Amino acid sequence: MAEKRAEKRKFNTDSWEPKTQVGRMVKEGTISDISYIMDKGLPLLEPEIVDVLLPDLEEQVLDVKLVQRMHKSGRRARYRATVVVGNKNGYVGVGMGKSKEVGPAIRKAIAQAKLSLIKVRVGCGSWECGCGSPHSIPFTAKGTCGSVKVELLPAPRGVGLVAGNVAKAVLGLAGVKDAWTTTYGDTRTTYNFAEATFDALNNLNFVRCLPEQKAKLGLTEGRVL
């Protein structure tokens, strides 16, 4: 189950009362770029910060399931939603939310996905291409979550996203247009599959590159446009 949410209304900044110092700085206009928050390692504790700094963020519901747990009074059922958010231009996040109703579960998952937002490195790391434009990923990356392992490989321009529907949704909203993927484990667990793909994208940020290597790979972080 993967469906895009209806176009949301523009966020009203006037009705927002920030609870953190970063939130107050964003509302005052002191911080106007989300990359500044990430580069400085400032805590991102309010989803409204993302609403203000990334108004073009898109949301996609990957899965909604009814889960149960045993209690002394009997079985208790709740809905679990998995959501991915991204602007298709270098920023992506994955979140999960639980509630007794579907709507609140999805809203919790969206808020959690916004708080987990990361910058994505894009480039052209395929030896078959070498165009130097940011259409793929700059190098191979691996990610894990539970039993699921995902390996992302750079692909030449025009190949598209060779991946399962969940990984394709995460990569697409991150701004990656061409990539090969290899998966291991129980990929039927939607959240683990999405989180493993997200972890692989995040691991791209920990690879050190020389300036000449960055130029050759066309490596770009965050916004491309």
UniProtKB/Swiss-Prot annotation:
Keywords, alphabetical: Ribonucleoprotein, Ribosomal protein, RNA-binding, rRNA-binding
GO cellular component terms listed in the entry, alphabetical order: cytosolic small ribosomal subunit
Intrachain S-S bonds: none
TM stretches of this protein: none
GO molecular function annotations of the record: rRNA binding; structural constituent of ribosome
Pfam families, A to Z: Ribosomal_S5 (PF00333), Ribosomal_S5_C (PF03719)
SUPFAM superfamilies: dsRNA-binding domain-like, Ribosomal protein S5 domain 2-like
Keyword Ribosomal protein carried by entry: yes
One GO term (biological process): translation
InterPro entries in UniProt: Ribosomal_Su5_D2-typ_SF (IPR020568), Ribosomal_uS5 (IPR000851), Ribosomal_uS5_arc (IPR047866), Ribosomal_uS5_C (IPR005324), Ribosomal_uS5_euk/arc (IPR005711), Ribosomal_uS5_N (IPR013810), Ribosomal_uS5_N_CS (IPR018192), Ribsml_uS5_D2-typ_fold_subgr (IPR014721)
Gene3D superfamilies registered for this protein in UniProt: 3.30.160.20, 3.30.230.10
Domain S5 DRBM: 57-120
Subunit structure: Part of the 30S ribosomal subunit. Contacts protein S4.
Physiological role: With S4 and S12 plays an important role in translational accuracy.
Family note: Belongs to the universal ribosomal protein uS5 family.
Free-text note on domains in this protein's UniProt record: The N-terminal domain interacts with the head of the 30S subunit; the C-terminal domain interacts with the body and contacts protein S4. The interaction surface between S4 and S5 is involved in control of translational fidelity.
Protein's name according to its UniProt entry: Small ribosomal subunit protein uS5
Gene this protein is translated from: rps5
